[in-house]
């Protein structure tokens, strides 16, 4: 399981710890990832994702998982999010066919 947000693509960064005496030692800056379940209205079920806390805020700010994915262009989404977006689009088309 990679340390990367499945919505925003935020991952591990590297840098230095710098002491008061200006000694440098390498370190890793890990993203604050949380395993969360987000409800998809179109799919009618909860989707488990590994998101950064910033990614959770972004999804909620944009009106939920479905609204966020449908309004975001594919070039800005990681591959996992693009696959989920395709699932949502297919389910939306099936619902449109069923009502028509």
Swiss-Prot record:
InterPro entries: Ribosomal_bL28 (IPR026569), Ribosomal_bL28/bL31-like_sf (IPR034704), Ribosomal_bL28_bact-type (IPR001383), Ribosomal_bL28_sf (IPR037147). Belongs to the bacterial ribosomal protein bL28 family. Keywords: Ribonucleoprotein, Ribosomal protein. GO terms for cellular component: cytosolic large ribosomal subunit. GO terms for biological process: translation. Pfam families: Ribosomal_L28. It comes from Gluconacetobacter diazotrophicus (strain ATCC 49037 / DSM 5601 / CCUG 37298 / CIP 103539 / LMG 7603 / PAl5). GO terms for molecular function: structural constituent of ribosome. This is Large ribosomal subunit protein bL28.
